[in-house]
Each structure stands twice: as structure tokens, then as C-alpha cells.
UniProtKB/Swiss-Prot annotation:
GO terms for biological process: intracellular signal transduction; negative regulation of cell size; negative regulation of TORC1 signaling; negative regulation of TORC2 signaling; positive regulation of autophagy; regulation of extrinsic apoptotic signaling pathway. The modification Phosphotyrosine is found at Y289. It is found in: Lysosome membrane. The gene is Deptor. This is DEP domain-containing mTOR-interacting protein. Residues 330-407 form the PDZ domain. It comes from Mus musculus (Mouse). GO terms for cellular component: lysosomal membrane. A motif (DDEX motif) lies at residues 217-235. CDD domains: DEP_1_DEP6 (cd04442), DEP_2_DEP6 (cd04441), PDZ_DEPTOR-like (cd23067). Keywords: Acetylation, Lipid-binding, Lysosome, Membrane, Phosphoprotein, Repeat, Ubl conjugation. Residues 1-23 are annotated as: Disordered.
Length: 409
């Protein structure tokens, strides 16, 4: 995160040394730990460090063995020694990101005990700060969609800033995307995002107001974190590079000196493979179903893109046309040890490409060809499958999905 540009001292800066500044730094710290923990969780799923394990005739889903994980951290140069690895994992335990499977040990120990990420068993505490953070992360992912052009280089008071959004346009977008039902509600959401340090005015001079003022996200959600950063007690902003899309730096007017504004090179950018299963990568079977989780490795993920199951392209407008031959259905799907068991594909709207016949989605009644209308109450008719998948993967284990099904499909 960035504390703000050098372009003047705003009202937020005046409290930097007081309780407001301390609270802001704590929110930034919490957000960094959440992102770091989530990136580690996904890597461990991908490399099968997290898996179902048995002990005394009982199966513990989605677990890792503390001793094995410490070996892995050292092998992958995420920790220099075992003592450091223990300290790193204790940081995640202290933040409620991991825990002993039976909650019998508060301390992370270098022994053969089972631990689990709380996000993998539905016990992750969603307090107001975490909810605001997850909402902000999801909004950013939607804004990064190729179909969205809201984030643009713009000038304010003679200074050029990258990846900005205009307040009034952002409010329009929030209502249009179903993130808020009214403009007032959208503005209240922006105030919450600002209060939690997720967005800010480009030069940190103004609160959020419905105007032509420019704002940015404070945090680079996509930057690959090193686990060792958890031991760095300084402000996370010192770890952001100038190539971060969230850096609030003044931009040169000389286009020859401008940067590409990418957090990482395209080949190393975080990939999201939208199979909506939390198990490790596997090849695509003849049925078109495959299981995977988002991969954070530098090498491209194995992507399986079977031919669309749809008979013909369908638009969101067509689905919502009065009298259209589509029926609405709502499913409550509780993820099992490896996920939810379906594949989403397409854009505006997304559709169900494949369903694991033995998975939770099939048991709830999900079928191929259905169009995804909403996820946990949020309208997703106008986003692509990557955004839908990220919404599901970063949400609770129990998901409520509304779909529309063609009557003769």
C-alpha cells in the first residue's frame, strides 16, 4: 500500500502520527497478511501439500502437516531455517488464518500435527475489516476485467496519475454492476472502502465525494508476496515497487519515460483457472470436467478449454426479456473437501460448462447450459467467468447461486 502522493498534505496526513495513523497502518498490515496467507494457501493446494489426511481411522479434509510444511517452506526458499518458518506460520495463526484441526494447540509447532487454513473449513472469521477488504479485492478484480475501462491514466491539478477512477463514474458503475441498488448506497460503500484504507484520493487531499475527483486503490492485490515479509514490521508500502498499479506516484508528462504500469510481467501475472474446485491441478478429461485452483506459479497453468456446451450465444438482455423461455433456479452449494464441483465459462453471461456428477453442485441440482445470474446475492450477469470464479474462490464455503435455465435445454 502507499501512504499517499507527495502532492500536498491532505486531511488524512494530519492524523498520520495519531490514533488514525496507527489504525490505518494496522488495517494495511492486516490486508497484507490476508493476501500473503491466501497466496500461500493456493500454492499449497496446487502442490498437494494441502490434502485429505487420515489419523486413527478419521479423515481430516484439506490439511497440511506442520513438519512437512516447514520442510516445504525451506525447500522453496520461503524461510531460511526452521525457526523462521515457525515464526512465519505463527503470524498466520495469530491472525486467524490457520489453526490446528482440533484447536488443541494455539502455537504452531514443528511436529507431525495437522493444521488447516480456516478458509478451507468455513471457520474464517468475517469481521467488518475482513469483509471490507474482500469486497475491495473483488471490486478490483472486476475493474481489471478486459471489458471494463474505468481505470485510466488521468490528470488532476496538473499531475498525471495512473489507474485512476473518477468518483461519479465509479458510482455509476457500482449501480450498473449490481454492487449497489442506489447511488446513495454506492456512495456509502465507497466511504467504507475509504475508511478501511482500500481506496483514497490520488493526492490524499479529499474524502470520497460524488464528483470529478480522482481516486485509486491503495493496495496491489496481485503483487506476489514473499512469506518473509510477514516478519517485516515496517509499513507494507515500503515493499511496493514503482511498477505497482496502486503506487500513488506522480507520473511524468513525457510519455517516453512512462512505465507500462504492470505489477509483474504478463508471463508471471497471477492466473486464475476457473474450474471452481479447490484441489490441485489435473488434466482435462474427455468429459470436459477438470479440477483446479488458481495458480500463482510463474509458469503458465494448464488450461483446459473444451468446446462450449451452449447451442448458441446468449446475451444478458435476452435472458431478461419478458416472456423469454428461461426458468430461474436457486441453489445452495456447500463445498466438500475439494471444492464445489463445476466449471464456469463465457462472459456476459457466464454459463455452467461442466458439472462433476459426484460433486456438491450436482447434488444441489446444477446442470450444464445454465446461466449464472448471481453469486451470494451479487449480480454477475455482466462479468466474465474469471470474475465469477474469483468471487466464489474468495468467498465462504457455502455459496448461494441463482441461475437461469433454458426450458428445452
Amino acid at each position: 500500500m502507499e501512504e499517499g502522493s507527495s502532492g500536498g498534505s491532505g486531511s488524512s496526513d494530519s492524523n498520520a502520527g495519531g490514533s488514525g495513523g496507527v489504525q490505518q497502518r494496522e488495517l494495511e498490515r492486516m490486508a497484507e497478511v490476508l493476501v500473503t496467507g491466501e497466496q500461500l494457501r493456493l500454492r499449497l493446494h496446487e502442490e498437494k501439500v494441502i490434502k485429505d489426511r487420515r489419523h486413527h481411522l478419521k479423515t481430516y479434509p484439506n490439511c497440511f502437516v506442520a513438519k512437512e510444511l516447514i520442510d516445504w517452506l525451506i525447500e522453496h526458499k520461503e524461510a531460511s531455517d526452521r525457526e523462521t518458518a515457525i515464526k512465519l506460520m505463527q503470524k498466520l495463526a495469530d491472525r486467524g488464518i490457520i489453526h490446528h484441526v482440533c484447536d488443541e494447540h494455539k502455537e504452531f509447532k514443528d511436529v507431525k500435527l495437522f493444521y488447516r487454513f480456516r478458509k478451507d473449513d468455513g471457520t474464517f472469521a468475517l469481521d467488518s475489516e475482513v469483509k471490507a477488504f474482500m469486497r475491495g479485492q473483488r471490486l478490483y478484480e472486476k475493474l481489471m476485467s478486459p471489458e471494463t475501462t474505468l481505470l485510466q491514466p488521468r490528470e488532476e491539478e496538473g499531475v498525471k496519475y495512473e489507474r485512476t477512477f473518477m468518483a461519479s463514474e465509479f458510482l455509476d458503475w457500482l449501480v450498473q454492476e449490481g454492487e449497489a441498488t442506489t447511488r446513495k448506497e454506492a456512495e456509502q460503500l465507497c466511504h467504507r472502502l475509504m475508511d478501511h484504507g482500500i481506496i483514497q484520493h490520488v493526492s490524499n487531499k479529499h474524502p470520497f465525494v460524488d464528483s470529478n475527483l480522482l481516486y485509486q486503490f491503495r493496495m496491489n492485490f496481485r503483487r506476489r508476496r514473499r512469506l518473509m515479509e510477514l516478519l517485516n514490521e515496517t509499513s507494507p508500502s515500503s515493499q511496493e515497487t514503482h511498477d505497482s498499479p496502486f503506487c500513488l506516484r506522480k507520473q511524468s508528462h513525457d510519455s517516453r519515460k512512462s512505465t507500462s504500469f504492470m505489477s509483474v510481467s504478463p508471463s508471471k501475472e497471477i492466473k486464475i483457472v476457473s474450474a471452481v474446485r479447490r484441489s490441485s491441478m489435473s488434466s482435462c478429461g474427455s468429459s470436459g470436467y477438470f479440477s483446479s485452483s488458481p495458480t500463482l506459479s510463474s509458469s503458465p497453468p494448464v488450461l483446459c478449454n473444451p468446446k462450449s456446451v451452449l447451442k448458441r450465444p446468449v446475451t444478458s438482455e435476452e435472458l431478461l426479456t419478458p416472456g423469454a423461455p428461461y426458468a430461474r433456479k436457486t441453489f445452495t452449494i456447500v463445498g466438500d473437501a475439494v471444492g464445489w464441483g463445476f466449471v464456469v465459462r463465457g462472459s456476459k453471461p457466464c454459463h455452467i460448462q461442466a458439472v462433476d456428477p459426484s460433486g456438491p453442485a450436482a447434488a444441489a441440482g446444477m446442470k450444464v447450459c445454465q446461466f449464472v445470474v448471481s453469486v451470494n446475492g451479487l449480480n454477475v450477469l455482466n462479468v466474465d467467468y474469471r470474475t465469477v470464479s474469483n468471487l466464489i474462490l474468495t468467498g465462504p464455503r457455502t455459496i448461494v447461486m441463482e441461475v437461469m435455465e433454458e426450458l428445452d435445454c
